[in-house]
């Protein structure tokens, strides 16, 4: 019996590495570590990086570097030319294993995963489970030294065509019993009490699965057991037989939940790239509140 059929992970090792593993591979020249920390309270990720990071890590401001400049939606996915330029600037080449971390359980690192997936390099990417939170709790080394420069070539490839979806696709899926639209935001965002676009609310028919509930958020921010996560998802109607479309405010938290679904073996997983920032700002699209 497979782990997935027994309620376990279908494919955890293709997405995560442990702090033990990274600790043993810090000097591996084939690995590039990226610090993906970002804050929405006035702090800057680069300042946190300069104060201390995992040895050898480089800092990526993914919110600007991996977002297209041609779209008003904040984090709309970068195109291939931009992806190539950014990855090469950070020393990530075609043969590199990129290990990304943050201090929010992989929340921000997952957006980098989504970029690597879209541009055909998912196999060369892992998230550090527990991130800097677990790393520091274990008393592992911290450095203030900048990352060593590397000359590499990154070649964007054609990733899966159906990963990022449009508002029109989501609207159609909301009325499809074989699909489920998954809102991973806070309850106040879901109900419309907290307004972060022109309008507050949610996609009609969407179900809510709060992304932090998939993690041991109050301790080391590693993932809960697959059995716990499967039960939480099933209670919301997010089952493997249905196509799942995740969204949040800017497709960052949504990327994190999509990654979890992939680890569990869900075969049809999509991310609404525009998310609520787009949906809530388009008067032609319906909303639900309360």
Regions found by a protein language model. Name each.
Residues 2-12, 74-173, 193-194, 253-275:
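Thiolate-centered catalytic microenvironments shared by cysteine-dependent enzyme domains
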Residues 6-92, 166-240, 281, 287-290:
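Positively charged, proline/Ser/Thr-rich regional signature most characteristic
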Residues 101-102, 197, 201, 244-247, ...:
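Short glycine- and Lys/Arg-enriched binding-loop motifs that mark or flank ligand-binding interfaces
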Residues 68, 102, 150, 212, ...:
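Amphipathic, positively biased hydrophobic alpha-helical segments used for protein targeting
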Residues 33, 100, 127, 181-183, ...:
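Structural beta-sheet core signal
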Residues 231-290:
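C-terminal appended segment following the main domain
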